[in-house]
């Protein structure tokens, strides 16, 4: 059985754990670098990316997460996770640099501009995925190595590169497990 960690420093940790378990994998909370040992994949949940980065630095998690990815282990970042995994963040904040694109934080607006949208994802077929966007980022300037999986208003909201999967929205807040199934079946 696949073992998936959830970075448990902020955000929708419990919701991701439920989604992982409902997809048939084992879920573990990751709070320290030694918690990464033995995992097949890692989820960086939504939250506030600046706060998450500061906590990751305080607990010395930035380099261990990069090393985890460099071993070919899969990482799935949602919302703030997308921001942290991007090569660059508009404004010059430090990132993990694991997907070759630039993240635009709060790209669709602030909290009051949060919304839901139907996404047609080729890998999923029908029906469309009902995505929940909360202070959502998006990606720009992807390299040729990045596969765009979904867009809203011509903005990249889901993508993958090698062993890294990112979404600008919160699949863990829906009852639709297709993104986690995709991660477990195609990436891990």
UniProtKB/Swiss-Prot annotation:
GO terms for cellular component: cytosol; glutaminase complex. Pfam families: SNO (PF01174). Its EC number is 4.3.3.6, 3.5.1.2. HAMAP family: PdxT (MF_01615). The keyword Hydrolase applies. Belongs to the glutaminase PdxT/SNO family. GO terms for molecular function: glutaminase activity; pyridoxal 5'-phosphate synthase (glutamine hydrolysing) activity. The keyword ATP-binding does not apply. Keywords: Glutamine amidotransferase, Hydrolase, Lyase, Pyridoxal phosphate. Pathway: Cofactor biosynthesis; pyridoxal 5'-phosphate biosynthesis. GO terms for biological process: glutamine catabolic process; pyridoxal phosphate biosynthetic process; pyridoxine metabolic process. This is Pyridoxal 5'-phosphate synthase subunit PdxT. Gene3D superfamilies: 3.40.50.880. SUPFAM superfamilies: Class I glutamine amidotransferase-like. InterPro entries: Class_I_gatase-like (IPR029062), PdxT/SNO (IPR002161), PdxT/SNO_CS (IPR021196). It catalyses: aldehydo-D-ribose 5-phosphate + D-glyceraldehyde 3-phosphate + L-glutamine = pyridoxal 5'-phosphate + L-glutamate + phosphate + 3 H2O + H(+); L-glutamine + H2O = L-glutamate + NH4(+). In the presence of PdxS, forms a dodecamer of heterodimers. Only shows activity in the heterodimer. Catalyzes the hydrolysis of glutamine to glutamate and ammonia as part of the biosynthesis of pyridoxal 5'-phosphate. The resulting ammonia molecule is channeled to the active site of PdxS. L-glutamine binds at residues 47-49, 105, 134-135. The active site is at 79 (nucleophile), 170 (charge relay system), 172 (charge relay system).
């Amino acid at each position: 059985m696949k073992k998936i960690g959830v970075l448990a420093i902020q955000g929708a940790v419990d919701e991701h754990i439920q989604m992982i378990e409902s997809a048939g994998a084992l879920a573990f909370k990751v709070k320290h670098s030694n918690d990464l040992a033995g995992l097949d994949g890692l989820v960086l949940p939504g939250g506030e990316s600046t706060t998450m980065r500061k906590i990751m630095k305080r607990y010395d998690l930035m380099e261990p997460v990069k090393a985890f990815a460099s071993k070919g282990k899969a990482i799935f970042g949602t919302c703030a996770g997308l921001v942290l995994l991007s090569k660059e963040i508009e404004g010059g904040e430090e990132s993990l640099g694991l997907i070759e694109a630039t993240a635009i934080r709060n790209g669709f607006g602030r909290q009051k501009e949060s919304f839901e949208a139907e996404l047609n994802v080729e890998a999923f077929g029908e029906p469309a995925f009902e995505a929940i966007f909360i202070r959502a980022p998006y990606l720009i300037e992807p390299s040729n190595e990045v596969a765009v999986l979904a867009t809203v208003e011509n903005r990249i909201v889901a993508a993958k590169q090698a062993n890294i999967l990112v979404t600008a929205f919160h699949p863990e807040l829906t009852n639709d497990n297709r993104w986690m199934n995709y991660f477990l079946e195609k990436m891990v």
